[in-house]
Amino acid sequence: MAIYHLETKVVSRGTGRSAVAAAAYMSCSQILNDYDGVQHDFTRKKGLVWQQIFLPEYAPVEWQERAVLWNAVEENEKTKDSRLAREFVVALPVELNKKPWKSLLSDFINEQFVADGMCADVAIHDPHPPGHNPHAHILSLIHISEPTRP
């Protein structure tokens, strides 16, 4: 039986967090935070199933690169207690396999984030043993990304 779990958090400098670090963790990657010079390396983390960045059609193409997107967010927010991103962690039903997980998340993100002009970075984790705790991390902008004006 599927177990419902949804957790929401705010990634804030005031609590010592970084959007770049959160993105590196969820994507099991290594990203340099240009704001504070810290290299966040989660390449040894296991269980990454899928990752994708969803952007509104008018968002800059270079935001498809995770490091560029989240460093732009860090650069844009200037104060020591800036709210940088919203983070969602949602349990995925073990009864389904990877393809329906991707489809469910893609539909949800397009309807709830992209349609409202927000970027969202998503990753599915299925840690060892596989099927034990499948879940998705969604990192979204706090502020709606505005279309570029000519």
Give a label for each model feature:
Residues 146-150:
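Short "domain-exit" segments at the C-terminal end of structured domains
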